[in-house]
Amino acid sequence: GETKNQNGFEILDEVIGWCKEAGIYVILDMHDAPGGQTGDNIDDSYAYPWLMENAENQKQFIEIWTRIAKKYANNTTILGYDLLNEPIAHYFKDDLPRLNKNLEKLYKECTLAIRKVDKNHIIMLGGAQWNGNFSFFTDWKYDDKMMFTCHRYWSGTDKQSIQDFIDFRDKVNLPMYMGETGENTDEWVEKFRITLEENNIGWTYWPYKKMVQKSGMMYIPKPENWDLIVEYTKKDRSDLGKVRDARPNQELVKKAMLDLLENMKFKNCVKIEGYTKALGMKP
């Protein structure tokens, strides 16, 4: 999460400015919440969604969103706020009923806090268990600019594969938005995209660019010596001595990271035409 001593707003302002110039709407999404909201590698947590248990983490979470909302309350480039990315992984089976209940309570508290400073923007609530479970929601009438957001990977491509999302959307009579999907073949991407559109579910595919060919619209060329970093992550680092022994040459690692930053620039990426066509866009 962005804190008072960081330059997060400067970075956000720059990116939002680029999007405004390009005519692109922005959805602000919190991927790494205080304490961790998921309990897996995507939220930099300690392998548990402590945000759902810790009052201080929850206070900071709400404060961050309130500061963001206050700053951007009248910004028309921002479409809305996606409060949490993929909260509460499915691993914690015995704890899920309690964690999911705490999530709904936190969503409501955060939404009401945001509305004190921003009555304009859409607020998006993701389902629990990888944005896939909406069955625990009991209240969706406390805000009139609210919608839900789902994620789905590695499923079928027909209507049945999203029927649970359709059923929940129709039950609550609020929009459902597919905030993440993809990571599949061009054929799968096209069929699933068409199914979403036929069922009036908006979408964004993940990711835009990646260092894996055919996983996005753009491919980042792999830097020289990048495999040194990859191999280091696979080695035994169970004590500090093994960490030191496994550590690769730091100059080569530094060069690989700097080369990555250079390769990530649009002009140096490779366009994946098949994936782009599958999304119904011109390559």
Give residue ranges: language-model regions.
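Residue-identity detector for glutamine
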Residues: 2, 6, 37, 58-60, ...
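An active-site-proximal structural segment forming one wall of the substrate-binding cleft
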Residues: 1-83, 106-115
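Extended, alpha-helix-rich binding/interface surfaces that flank or overlap catalytic cores
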Residues: 195, 199-283
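Intrinsic-disorder/low-complexity, polar/charged segments
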Residues: 54, 183-185, 249-250, 254
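Alpha-helix capping and helix-coil boundary motifs
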Residues: 3-7, 158, 185, 239
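Extracellular glycoside hydrolase catalytic/binding regions
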Residues: 62-210, 215-233
